Regions:
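Interfacial loop-to-helix junctions that mark the boundaries of transmembrane helices
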Residues: 1-6, 63-72, 123, 185-193, ...
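Transmembrane helix-loop-helix hairpins at membrane boundaries of multipass inner-membrane proteins
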Residues: 1-104, 181-184, 217, 492
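Alpha-helical transmembrane segments of polytopic membrane proteins
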Residues: 4-11, 72-77, 261-265, 324, ...
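Hydrophobic core of alpha-helical transmembrane segments in multi-pass integral membrane proteins
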Residues: 10-23, 35-51, 80-87, 170, ...
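Membrane-interfacial helical/loop segments at transmembrane boundaries in membrane proteins
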Residues: 56-61, 185-187, 378-389, 448-469
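Hydrophobic transmembrane alpha-helices and their helix-loop junctions in integral membrane proteins
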Residues: 85-95, 100, 108-125, 135-427
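Cytoplasmic/organellar membrane-interface segments at the starts of transmembrane helices
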Residues: 350-352, 411-492
């Protein structure tokens, strides 16, 4: 009990205590090397403690309760892993200018991101969510350029709108529940007289972070200007906080809401396909990846809609969404870190580099025997025709296939613009190490990380041989479309 409490407490205390290193300018180099250490207690908690671990803090705010369940464990492992590998990468990536300022905002954002995942009471959850959001502004504007400041203003404006909506929704839900615990909110929201208003506020507020269509504007502006390690955690971990907010507050499993389900499936489809349409028109690698994140979160929004529409499948869909979050976060973190890698001098080294860049991208598209294939097969098994009875249900398999084609088109576009932007040179050892760990996490370690117990059997490697064609054809279709587009442009 003491060890588990200590780990949960250290997960937050260590990043906050590291701020003491910012008191003296001559400690900033030591602070840089501490960045990879800060998420270690959280990672150990996620890997060792497992569901059921909890820590009561009666003197904190209105009474704090931090802990893990199956869903939070997956989110915590992903979040801590991404911040760790990005921290390793940052040691080699960061320059001397504004180093201390970067480390301060990094530690504050990390504490908020880890805290909101573990928080089980409303006050802690919202406090950590707000800390992550507003400290993240410092990472977005770190470079201080005109473009960064513009992105920061848009980010801050959208953040304020989102936080106001979240706080209003949480207060209304808490009043209805008569409780300060997140676990009591779904049932209370389901029975509330103003359920539609509470749900709208929570969907919109968390939707800002999750990149919901029409609330996504900050994403393609912030990612290109933020330092590369910050972009990796913005897209790989922080954007998932919006999804987690939905999953722990909305009335999943309490009442079937087919109208809300239909609306979210449509919004998810718009995000998935619209993000791809806008993304393939971009010319900067990180901007393409930002739109790819919007597209991928569209698939998550689609699944949220399906879970709201049918109480019976809410639990299994939670497990599949958690698996998809783990896959997408690791792959996207690797891709973002790769944008800062210089090409080695030798041809063999360049081929190896491009292979390791391409594989996480192909995983996003569902290449067999990758984490993406596991996630997509699990989704396909649940969203097959006949499982759901709301209006948009018959279109779910088609939308998933279209999303897979859209993802592969974005992967090809990313590789094309990354090839044009790449330059030769040497990379610091810590950059190689951080990017290598992120890539290994996506391609290899994913299979040994904690998975939710309710993940369908189809997600396992043994089934991928029989499902190879269903995984391959979207990749082949997107490749054919990309080849035709390239040929058309070349002939002009």
């Amino acid at each position: 009990m003491f060890a588990s409490n200590l780990l949960l407490l250290l997960a937050i205390i260590l990043p906050l205590a590291s701020l003491l290193l910012a008191l003296r300018p001559d400690w900033q180099q030591a602070y840089r090397y501490c960045l990879p250490v800060l998420p270690l207690p959280a990672l150990l908690a996620g890997l060792i403690l497992g569901p059921g671990a909890s820590l009561e803090l009666p003197g904190l705010l209105l009474g704090g309760l931090w802990g893990l369940d199956e869903l939070r464990q997956v989110f915590l492992v992903l979040t801590a892993t991404l911040w760790l590998v990005a921290g390793v990468f940052a040691v080699g990536y960061l320059k001397v200018h504004y180093l201390r300022r970067f480390c301060v905002f990094w530690a504050l954002t990390l504490a908020g991101n880890l805290g909101l995942v573990m928080a089980q009471d409303i006050a802690s959850f919202y406090s950590f969510f707000a800390l992550m959001t507003f400290a993240g502004y410092g990472l977005v504007v770190h470079e201080g350029t005109g473009e960064a400041n513009h992105a920061g203003r848009v980010y801050l404006a959208m953040a304020v709108v989102g936080e106001m909506a979240i706080l209003s929704g949480l207060l209304m839900a808490a009043q209805q529940a008569g409780s300060g615990l997140l676990a009591d909110l779904p049932a209370a929201v389901a029975e509330a007289d103003r359920r539609w208003l509470i749900m709208f506020l929570l969907l919109a507020g968390f939707g800002v972070k999750a990149g919901l269509p029409l609330l996504h504007f900050w994403l393609p502006l912030a990612h290109p200007v933020a330092p590369t390690p910050a972009s990796a955690v913005l897209s790989g971990a922080m954007i998932k906080a919006g999804l987690l907010g939905w999953l722990v507050t909305l009335p999943f499993g309490e009442v079937s809401l087919p109208d809300w389900g239909n609306a979210l499936v449509i919004l998810g489809a718009v995000g998935s396909l619209g993000g791809a349409v806008l993304g393939v028109r971009q010319r900067r690698p990180k901007t393409v990846l930002a739109y790819s994140s919007i597209s991928q979160m569209g698939l998550m929004t689609l699944m949220v809609g399906a879970a709201l529409a049918n109480t019976e499948y809410a639990g299994p869909l939670f497990a599949v969404m958690a698996l998809y979050v783990l896959h997408h976060g690791l792959a996207k973190g690797s891709l973002f870190l790769s944008t800062a890698m210089a090409l080695p001098a030798g041809r063999a080294g360049q081929w190896l580099l491009w292979l390791l860049i391409a594989l996480p991208g192909l995983s996003l598209a569902g290449l067999p025997f990758t984490s993406g294939a596991a996630s997509k097969l699990a989704m396909k098994d649940l969203l097959k025709p006949g499982n759901f009875e709301f209006a948009m249900a018959p279109y779910l398999p088609m939308l998933m296939s279209a999303g897979a084609v859209a993802t592969m088109l974005l992967v090809w576009r990313f590789l094309w613009v990354q090839r044009a932007a790449a330059s030769g040179g040497s990379n610091p050892a810590f950059m190689y190490l951080g990017w290598g760990l992120a890539t290994a996490g996506s391609l290899v370690l994913f299979w040994w990380l904690p998975w939710p117990g309710a993940v369908p059997d189809k997600a396992w490697l043994a089934t991928m041989v029989y499902e190879a064609w269903s995984l391959f054809w979207p990749i082949l279709a997107a490749t054919a479309i990309a080849a035709l587009a390239w040929r058309s442009v070349k002939q002009r």
